[in-house]
C-alpha cells in the first residue's frame, strides 16, 4: 500500500517543482504605452522634459515667461525646455549649449514657489548671500568662482547654474538680466 502512494506523491512533487521553476516572462505588448513597458524586469521612464523651438512656445507651455541673457560663458546656442510633473509643478529651463558634444555651459530654471529647483547637490566651499536688484541671491562656488545662484522673486524660484564658474561680478550681471 505504501508503495502505491509513494509514486503519485513523487510525481505530484516533481510536477510542482517543474512548474515553479519556470521563470516568468515580462508581459510587453505593442498596445502598452512606452512609459509602461517592462523590459528585463525594469520599467522605462519617459524623459519629463519637452523641448521647444522658441522661448515664446516654451512660455506658452509653462504658463509663464523667462527672460534670459543673450549669451552665457560665450555660448548663445539655447534650448528651451519645460517639465510639467502633472501635479502642478512646472519648470521652465533654458540650456546654453557649448557645442556638438551635448554639454551645456549653463542653465536657467524658473518655477512657481520658493523651493530650491536647482537639482545641484554639490557641496560648495563658498556660499554668500547678496542683494541684486532688491533680490536676495544665494551664490555658491569654489576657489573664488560662482557656479550656482538661487533666488526667489514675485512668487517664482530661479536658478542660474554655470558649469565652469564665473566671477561674482559676472554672475551678478547675469542674475540682473533674468526675470
What is each PLM-predicted segment?
Residues 1-9:
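Positively charged n-region of N-terminal signal peptides that target proteins for export
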Residues 16-19:
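C-terminal motif of bacterial Sec signal peptides marking the signal peptidase cleavage site
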Residues 21-23:
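Bacterial signal peptide processing site
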Residues 25-35:
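N-terminal hydrophobic targeting segments that direct proteins to the cell envelope
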Residues 27, 65, 174-178:
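Conserved short hydrophobic interaction patches
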Residues 36-146, 153:
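Short, solvent-exposed recognition patches
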Residues 154-179:
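Surface-exposed amphipathic alpha-helical segments
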